[in-house]
Curated annotation (Swiss-Prot):
MF term (GO), any: FAD binding
UniProt-annotated catalytic positions: R169, S218, E288
Native organism taxonomy: Bacteria, Pseudomonadati, Thermodesulfobacteriota, Desulfuromonadia, Desulfuromonadales
Cell cycle among keywords: yes
Organism: Pelobacter propionicus (strain DSM 2379 / NBRC 103807 / OttBd1)
Name of protein: UDP-N-acetylenolpyruvoylglucosamine reductase
Described purpose of this protein according to its UniProt entry: Cell wall formation.
Major location category of this protein: cytoplasm
EC number: 1.3.1.98
Amino acid sequence: MNLSGLNMRGLLLADEPMSRHTSLRVGGPADLFAIPEDADDLQGLLRQLKERGIPWLAIGRGNNLLVRDSGIRGAVISLERFNRVEALGQGRIRAGAGAENLAVVRFAQEQGLGGIGFISGIPGTVGGAIRMNAGAYGTGIMERTESLTLLHDGNVREFGRDELEYGYRHLDLAAGDIILEALFRLDQREAEQTEEEIRKDLELRRAKHSVGFPSAGSFFKNPAGQTAWRLIDATGMRGERVGGAQVSQVHSNFLVNTGGATAGDFLELSRVVKKAVLASCGVTLEEEVRIVGEE
C-alpha cells in the first residue's frame, strides 16, 4: 500500500493510534490519519486514495466507535474541521458534520430557536448524530433535519429528508457517502425555555449515564418494546468484567474501560453479554457501537 506522496492542505499522520481518537480509548493504529481542511481538500484526498486503491473510513469524534486492536488498514479521515454553524433565517440552521452537538444547540438558542435540545447531552458531533439518527425520549435527530449535504460518488450533493431512508438509530447511506453538513428546521423558542431543556437533559444524562470511566455510551440497541439495560440486568451481568472492560455498575448498557482495556476485551465482553441475554431472555442484542478495523 503506497501512502507516500499524498498531498493535502490539512494534517496527515502515519501509524496513528486510534485509541487517541475514540471515547473508549482503545484501538490499534490507522495506517494513515487525515484531517482535511474543507470539502475541496477532502475531495482531493479521496481522488488520490482512489487512484492508489487505498481504502478509507470517515469518522467524527469517535464517540460511537470500537476499533479492533489490529488497527485500520488504509486511511481514517477525521471531519473535525467541518465545524461551521450558521443561521439561514426562517428557523433554519446549517451545521457542519464536525460541529459538536451541544455547540449547535447553543448556537440555535442564540438565534431564538429550539427543538433539538435532546442532543445536548449526547457526546459527539452532528455527523455522528445524523449517521446514527441519535435521539432521546422517543425523538430522533432526523425528524428535525430538512436536508443533508453529502459527498456522494465524489460529488457534493444535497439530499432532502424525503430522499433518505432512516429509522431507529440508523440512516441508510450508499457505500462511500460522507455527511458534510446538515440543515435543521427549528422552532421559534425563548432562550430561557431552551436553557431549561438543556439543563434538564444534561442533568438527566449525568444522573443516569455518568459512569466514571471511558465509554461509548449505549453499547447495545434497545430491542423493539424493550430496553437493553433491563435485559442485561435480568441476567445478572451488571459489573461483569473481561480484562479492563466492564459492564458498568451505574448503567448496564454501558461497557466501560476501567483501565488498560483492549478492543479484544470489549468484543469478548460483548459476546458474553449477548450470549447471556439470549439464553436468559430469548433476545438477540445488536451492538449500537460501530465496530471497525482489521480482524
